[in-house]
UniProtKB/Swiss-Prot annotation:
EC number per UniProt: 2.3.1.1
Function: N-acetylglutamate synthase involved in arginine biosynthesis.
UniProt subcellular location: Mitochondrion
Keyword Mitochondrion on entry: yes
Entry's Gene Ontology BP terms: arginine biosynthetic process via ornithine; glutamate metabolic process; L-arginine biosynthetic process; ornithine biosynthetic process
CDD domains: DUF619-NAGS-FABP
Biological pathway: Amino-acid biosynthesis; L-arginine biosynthesis; N(2)-acetyl-L-ornithine from L-glutamate: step 1/4
GO CC term, one of those recorded: mitochondrial matrix
Protein name, entry field: Amino-acid acetyltransferase, mitochondrial
Pfam families referenced in this protein's UniProt entry, alphabetically: NAT
Gene Ontology molecular function: L-glutamate N-acetyltransferase activity
The keyword Lipid biosynthesis is assigned to this record: no
Domain N-acetyltransferase residues, every copy: 336-496
Amino acid sequence: MQKPSLSQDLIWILKSVQSRRSTKGFLQKHSSLKDGSPNKKSFAQPISSSFLNRISITKIDDVDSLSDNTLYGIGRSINSLARLGIQSVIVPTSNPIGMTSPFKYLENGTVVAKKRKLSIFEELQQQQNRVIRVSEIFSKAGVLTRPSYSSVCQLGPEGPSVENVQGIFQALSSLYTVIVPSSILMPNVIEVPIDGNEVLAGLTYSLHKPNFGFWVDRIVILDKNGGMPCSKRQTGSSHVLINLAQEFDELAKTLPPYHRKNLILVRRCLKMLPDDASALITTPEDAMLTNPVLDKNPLIHNVLTDRSIISCSLPRDRSPITKTTVLRSGVPVYTFLGPKCLTDGSVSWERLWVLINDSFKRTLDMDAYLDRLKNSLAAVIIAGDYLGTAIVTYEQPDGTTNEKVPYLDKLAVSQGAQGSAAISDVMFNVMTDLFPKELIWRSRLTNPVNKWYFERSVGSLKSSKTPWKLFWTGDSHVRNLDRVNQYMSVIDKIQPTWLN
């Protein structure tokens, strides 16, 4: 295995950047990083956030089944993340059905291990062998490794935690990648193997210390099964993005047990971290950084853009198969149907007015707008605490009597929430689920967002009468000119309600 050159890796990294906006966002987020030199601040005193060490905690499942070449490719990705200012802690595990059986709690408070095929000593020896193997192969890929051959976690009253946090912090500050076994020290000072999920949770709990300059930026799970399967996408494809605040309960009911376990683990870890932290689940093969493959690397792409490689709101029948899922704590999404919400107090229209003005940088004539909605409102979708909104109306096309077409009247995201939170994507998915047959909207010909709109539509057409461009989407693709003309009549006749 030939060691990659710096220029080769830099080319790979730059290939993952989608746009100038993505590059700018990465630089703004990571401008607080140190300039590549170890942090000389004392670990005993809180330090300024301008010296944050950003950490990725990665669990590699079933390492024994992975080839040296696969681990080498993963090591190259880890090395590239380090060059981007993300230091990693790696937890290699065995097949969860095999040797590393989890402990269990008894009602009397004691902890015992489940029935094992090997003795505890033999299992610990295998854990050490995994750490050694990963460390040696990662080193060949250019990673500066610091292997730990015994447990770094201990079991306390609140669950697993890191025993010697400063030791890991010192290694990370010196730009080492720390590799730890799936084992834990019990209260009686006996080391036993443990499910890697518990080690991942213990590391997350212990290593996120912003006041001391250490920030857990993301959780990564490399699993041969990949991300969470999605029934709405092509067979074999995963969810692209999971907004946990909105989707966890439903997914916990419907996912297969194996994926449900990962879902619960990720939510457990993200609850310990800030809202902008994220998790990524993908296959070991997709996580490899290899020269012959020209596809974008999901780990590097996610660090650079805070997004998945493909957008979750793109038409699903046109999206490629993916085995990568990005998960965020996210925001709850509330849906209000019909004009009742105009008067029943369920929606704060004053806050919506502020949100729309902030998003569009214009002032809405709220009285005129509400007057328009009272006879046409179909749905109001609100993301989080008025971070974003989508307002859909029913409009009557020319030449029809009772037919109504769902029309996206407003899609607004507050300036502070625009970008990596993917609020627009989340709301767009809710809309298309509410109105799967058809949904239309319009945009000025000069609107820079038109590329985003075009990618999510199944058709678009410029108006010959007004400065608008028509977009439409839905399960029933429009195949005749009459229907398009009806859509066009809707967007041409709606009058704007801005004060300026």
